[in-house]
Amino acid sequence: MLLPRSVSSERAPGVPEPEELWEAEMERLRGSGTPVRGLPYAMMDKRLIWQLREPAGVQTLRWQRWQRRRQTVERRLREAAQRLARGLGLWEGALYEIGGLFGTGIRSYFTFLRFLLLLNLLSLLLTASFVLLPLVWLRPPDPGPTLNLTLQCPGSRQSPPGVLRFHNQLWHVLTGRAFTNTYLFYGAYRVGPESSSVYSIRLAYLLSPLACLLLCFCGTLRRMVKGLPQKTLLGQGYQAPLSAKVFSSWDFCIRVQEAATIKKHEISNEFKVELEEGRRFQLMQQQTRAQTACRLLSYLRVNVLNGLLVVGAISAIFWATKYSQDNKEESLFLLLQYLPPGVIALVNFLGPLLFTFLVQLENYPPNTEVNLTLIWCVVLKLASLGMFSVSLGQTILCIGRDKSSCESYGYNVCDYQCWENSVGEELYKLSIFNFLLTVAFAFLVTLPRRLLVDRFSGRFWAWLEREEFLVPKNVLDIVAGQTVTWMGLFYCPLLPLLNSVFLFLTFYIKKYTLLKNSRASSRPFRASSSTFFFQLVLLLGLLLAAVPLGYVVSSIHSSWDCGLFTNYSAPWQVVPELVALGLPPIGQRALHYLGSHAFSFPLLIMLSLVLTVCVSQTQANARAIHRLRKQLVWQVQEKWHLVEDLSRLLPEPGPSDSPGPKYPASQASRPQSFCPGCPCPGSPGHQAPRPGPSVVDAAGLRSPCPGQHGAPASARRFRFPSGAEL
């Protein structure tokens, strides 16, 4: 209740009186713009605040009434939209089941997979809205025949005759050649000159991948920092007490046995995580300096071994890609086409297993083990994709190589007339191969292993058991597929559609594998820190995809034979041309100034000011949080002072008093004390216990509080009446 305290008590000097605090709080609530509905007070207090804000007889302005009505309508619409979104949410029931049976750590993987599906659908919607629909609706003029280039390519390779017998429709689909002349690849997009069209398809095609990357970056960053404000308010080392979880975890609205079983598993997993973290914290506190030094040296040894594995994997991928691109005339041409994806898949299959084995040797905490394994797996995967991109650049774009066919046209025109399509086909094959590997591993490895383990008995089968569902490895697979999709946004604009289908099917495949064929980890972990690392890994993949794309768009010559930018030295050259055609001289000068070095100095000063303001605001928020914590502690102590004053002022019941009729009716609603005579948690320090019902033994009177000896019986003070007395 927001009522002033009428009982005075001893107070330290400098502490304001309760009446002053109450008046200040009333004044703050009166002038605050926070809706009364959102205030953390009882209904009686909210009515009082409402009367303070709108006294009786005072007519509010029409604008204020309209504003209040609009806020109410917006709030109701927002709540209705949130309820509708929760009701129509994708895989809500499946996520609830997985979280209850296997814990929030494994559930975070499936939630992350759903988030990636949403990102791909948004990217597809952006590309279809700004590129595909205008291209179909406006029907831009035909650019005419392509340039007839006379190529001088000594010793150029031709397709080997033995390859023709393998060219069936299935192989064309797997390699992407069946879709070469469709909108799946870059080469099928053709328009006329910019001056002959109202809507610039070239500019839309150029900016759509950049907008998709920016949209994915903002969504990932928002999801990453989603829990940081709550973590800042609660503190770094905050943990909810086990007593609160024991008494408040159960949902009493459950009426179905299956839901009750899932809820029991969920509570059990939460307690396992809490107890495991507490046990490890105690072990860390008991270690000596020598044990700590040995532990750090073992950590260093494991990380060095993991680094050597990454270097070896990168070397294997580089030589496999180089051999595949340099030996196209051999009879094994079809197998060599899938040699780089095969080596990358083999590395990504063996790497997480080795990393998990090495990390588990050091007995890390579960969260640290998952995050460290995930970091090394991501380093391996992103490094392999980076090396794959570098090797393609050396072969197709002659980056770092001296080749005569690259001097005149800027790329290896003898072997790759439309090099954007070639790069798109490589990324298409990589995406297809990753999904096929996921399907094959689920139904050709995990399923037979489960059937054999369930069918036979013995030491070997007991040792083999079901496969453990490794979260780092599964996260690595979907992050790798998403990174490949981002890398192919320019060369294969509809690759997000393909990846969306793969992610949708992957969810059900992984769910079946988890529920039927796998076993959960015996060491559960929290979802909070793992979710943060998932988003961090995704940002690293986004950075890996954005750097090559920016380099290609700004510096690499486009193909002379296909695509939208055949007459441009680089795709970005279309932007200055459109600026010169569509903007007045003032706008051109303004854009030229924004892109010049002279604008960098005021931009740097402005960013410095913004950064200073943000840092200052962060520090002010931290100080405010510290003050609010102290105020909360003071309020708890103030309530205990009120209880002490009340216990001193109320009369003690005499020995002849009988319970029931002699107590006034107002005492019937008096709360019971959960710890009569003992200092309860949150009380201001240790005080002499108030004796309640005690146990008498041979030694005399005992205190009801554990570990404390009672006072004489004559020192009895007032205590709250028990339930039997009431």
From Swiss-Prot:
Top-level taxon: Eukaryota
Region of interest: Disordered: 651-726
Keyword vocabulary terms for this entry: Disease variant, Endoplasmic reticulum, Glycoprotein, Golgi apparatus, Membrane, Nucleus, Phosphoprotein, Transmembrane, Transmembrane helix
Any single GO CC term annotated in Swiss-Prot or TrEMBL for this entry: cytoplasm
Region feature TMC domain, mapped onto this chain: 362-530
Membrane topology classification: Multi-pass membrane protein
Sugar-bearing residue positions: N148, N567
Membrane topology (Lumenal): 136-200, 321-338, 448-488, 553-594
GO terms for biological process, alphabetical: intracellular zinc ion homeostasis; negative regulation of canonical NF-kappaB signal transduction; negative regulation of protein binding; negative regulation of protein-containing complex assembly; positive regulation of apoptotic process; protein stabilization; regulation of extrinsic apoptotic signaling pathway via death domain receptors; regulation of tumor necrosis factor-mediated signaling pathway
Keyword Transmembrane recorded: yes
InterPro entries listed in its UniProt record: TMC, TMC_dom
Any one GO molecular-function label of the UniProt entry: mechanosensitive monoatomic ion channel activity
Positions of post-translational Phosphoserine modification: S6, S658, S673
Record's compositionally biased regions (Pro residues): 652-662
Keyword GTP-binding: no
Location of the protein in the cell: Endoplasmic reticulum membrane; Golgi apparatus membrane; Nucleus membrane
Parts of the chain that traverse the membrane: 115-135, 201-221, 300-320, 339-359, 427-447, 489-509, 532-552, 595-615
Cytoplasmic side: 1-114, 222-299, 360-426, 510-531, 616-726
Tissue: Expressed in placenta, prostate and testis.
The record's note on its domains: The TMC domain mediates the interaction with SLC30A1/ZNT1.
Disease implication from the record: Epidermodysplasia verruciformis 2: A form of epidermodysplasia verruciformis, a rare genodermatosis associated with a high risk of skin carcinoma that results from an abnormal susceptibility to infection by specific human papillomaviruses, including the oncogenic HPV5. Infection leads to the early development of disseminated flat wart-like and pityriasis versicolor-like skin lesions. Cutaneous Bowen's carcinomas in situ and invasive squamous cell carcinomas develop in about half of the patients, mainly on sun-exposed skin areas. EV2 inheritance is autosomal recessive.
Subunit structure, interactors included: Interacts with TMC6. Interacts and forms a complex with TMC6 and CIB1; the interaction stabilizes each component of the complex. Interacts and forms a complex with TMC6 and SLC30A1/ZNT1; the interaction regulates zinc transport into the ER. Interacts with TRADD; the interaction competes with TRADD/RIPK1/TRAF2/cIAPs complex I formation and facilites complex II formation.
Function: Acts as a regulatory protein involved in the regulation of numerous cellular processes. Together with its homolog TMC6/EVER1, forms a complex with calcium-binding protein CIB1 in lymphocytes and keratynocytes where TMC6 and TMC8 stabilize CIB1 levels and reciprocally. Together with TMC6, also forms a complex with and activates zinc transporter ZNT1 at the ER membrane of keratynocytes, thereby facilitating zinc uptake into the ER. Also inhibits receptor-mediated calcium release from ER stores and calcium activated and volume regulated chloride channels.
Family indicated by similarity: Belongs to the TMC family.
Protein name: Transmembrane channel-like protein 8
Gene that this sequence comes from: TMC8
